[in-house]
């Protein structure tokens, strides 16, 4: 039974990732037109968390509805693309530079923030983003 559930979860995640990569006719959220999904994981309630390297946020996807779960939209650069940043704070006040992958970890989720060279932790009970490991400095020592 557990194997069947894992297979169904994987299949649903794959279908969701493919559907997000294709342009949508009707934009229900910014994710439908500006998303660059790179990581995905399922949540206990059946929704999904998707990391978005373009918008610099983590989305929560439930059915055809998507809302920002972690991170904040930042100002655009010269070409209008979000810049991102680094800030450990509440979910709706935190900044990511390049959220790459997401995975369940302890009582929350680990998110690799590739451009900041850190792994961030989103705790379920605290609704907070905090750095779990790494340093913002580039190099092989972190």
Predicted regions and their residues:
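Surface loops at the rim/top face of extracytoplasmic beta-rich domains
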Residues: 114-117, 134-135
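A short loop-to-beta-strand structural motif that recurs across blades of beta-propeller domains
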Residues: 56-60, 117-121
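Bacterial N-terminal signal peptides that target proteins for export
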Residues: 1-11
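C-terminal segment of classical bacterial N-terminal signal peptides
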Residues: 17-25
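Gly/Pro-rich loop segments of beta-rich domains
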Residues: 27-39, 65-98, 127-142
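Residue-level detector of Asp-centered blade-edge/turn motifs that repeat once per structural unit
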Residues: 42-45, 104-107
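Conserved beta-strand positions in repeat-built beta-propeller and related beta-rich domains
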Residues: 50-54, 111-115
């Amino acid at each position: 039974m557990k194997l069947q559930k894992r297979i169904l979860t994987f299949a649903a995640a794959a279908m969701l990732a493919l559907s997000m990569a294709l342009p949508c006719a009707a934009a229900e959220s910014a994710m439908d037109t500006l998303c660059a999904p790179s990581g995905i994981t399922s949540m206990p309630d059946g929704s999904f968390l998707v990391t978005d390297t373009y918008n610099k946020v983590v989305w929560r996807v439930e059915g055809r509805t998507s809302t920002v779960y972690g991170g904040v939209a930042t100002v655009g650069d010269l070409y209008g693309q979000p810049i991102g940043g680094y800030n450990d704070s509440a979910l709706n006040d935190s900044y990511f530079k390049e959220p790459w992958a997401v995975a369940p970890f302890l009582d929350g989720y680990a998110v690799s923030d590739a451009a900041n060279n850190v792994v961030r932790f989103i705790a379920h009970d605290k609704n907070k983003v905090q750095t779990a490991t790494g340093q913002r400095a580039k190099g092989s020592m972190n």
